[in-house]
Amino acid sequence: MNITITKKENPGKLPETDELGFGKYFTDHMFLMDYSDTDGWHNARIVPFGPVSMSPAAGVLHYGAEVFEGLKAYRRPDGGVQLFRPRENVRRINASCGRMCIPPLEPLVRPYRSAADQ
């Protein structure tokens, strides 16, 4: 799977480590991917963080069918990026998809690694 990456022109300032907290700070970027019956999951991309447009007729607004999995990545002392248990995250999100009757995602461990390398 190819992931198109569009980097934010002016990245935000990183918070101090003693100020971190869940839901308090957000990354400068977000991962998006489209789904259609004919193409399955496609058009994977990382874009600058921002509003997500959707139709008022979107099922998620009417029936609440959605899944979430919070993959974590940490900066290593050597400057590299370490993903925290990506295979387990993929298994959990696919299990959630199955429970919600949402098509499962393709195994995404390789694309996560590719994105972290960039």
Model-derived segments and their meaning:
Residues 1-118:
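Conserved alpha/beta cores of soluble small-molecule-handling proteins
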